[in-house]
């Protein structure tokens, strides 16, 4: 199916797969997923990649609710670097093996530091991309962190 799904199956992590018809004209991928799946946007999590200290070859991954904005200062602090900036589209796609709008935190080509916003812990399960547009994975946040080697911290604007 996708590297994300393959990883979850291989690691025997419980998850539920959800599909929906992606509108190619919609560029608000996380919002679209929440709307089409009929879930609270605070449970629909997006995957963002940043460049550490401006180096587009040294990326880190942040997973946060689609309703939130990533705070770059908090993000940098959470991974112990001076500053971060959003990774460019090509660098993100090359590092993950996924297209923008379908980037999953799971099964990326290159393993990178990953941080999940602490609001994920408010829910029994959250939704993340399954590795392509129109495919979402419902998973317990603790299981997601375990398989990614990720930490939970506050990385969003107030």
Swiss-Prot record:
Q: Any signal peptide, and if so, which residues?
A: none
**Keywords (A to Z) from UniProt:** Cytoplasm, Lyase, Protein biosynthesis
Example GO CC term: the record gives: cytoplasm
User: InterPro entries per the record?
Assistant: Prolyl-tRNA_editing_YbaK/EbsC (IPR004369), YbaK/aa-tRNA-synt-asso_dom_sf (IPR036754), YbaK/aa-tRNA-synth-assoc-dom (IPR007214)
Q: Where is this site: Participates in proton transfer during catalysis?
A: 29
What outcome follows a substitution of residue 46 to R? Answer: 44-fold decrease in Cys-tRNA(Pro) deacylation activity
Impact after mutating residue 47 to A: 21-fold decrease in Cys-tRNA(Pro) deacylation activity
Q: Which GO terms describe its biological process?
A: translation
Tell me what effect the entry lists for residue 129 to A: 5.6-fold decrease in Cys-tRNA(Pro) deacylation activity
- Gene Ontology MF terms: Ala-tRNA(Pro) deacylase activity; lyase activity
Mutating residue 134 to A leads to what result?
7.4-fold decrease in Cys-tRNA(Pro) deacylation activity
Q: What is the effect of changing residue 46 to I?
A: 38-fold decrease in Cys-tRNA(Pro) deacylation activity
Q: Which family does it belong to?
A: Belongs to the prolyl-tRNA editing family. YbaK/EbsC subfamily.
Biological function? Functions in trans to edit the amino acid from incorrectly charged Cys-tRNA(Pro) via a Cys-tRNA(Pro) deacylase activity. Probably compensates for the lack of Cys-tRNA(Pro) editing by ProRS. Is also able to deacylate Cys-tRNA(Cys), and displays weak deacylase activity in vitro against Gly-tRNA(Gly), as well as, at higher concentrations, some other correctly charged tRNAs. Does not cleave Pro-tRNA(Pro).
What protein is this chain from? Cys-tRNA(Pro)/Cys-tRNA(Cys) deacylase YbaK
Q: What's the source species' lineage?
A: Bacteria, Pseudomonadati, Pseudomonadota, Gammaproteobacteria, Pasteurellales
Gene of this entry: ybaK
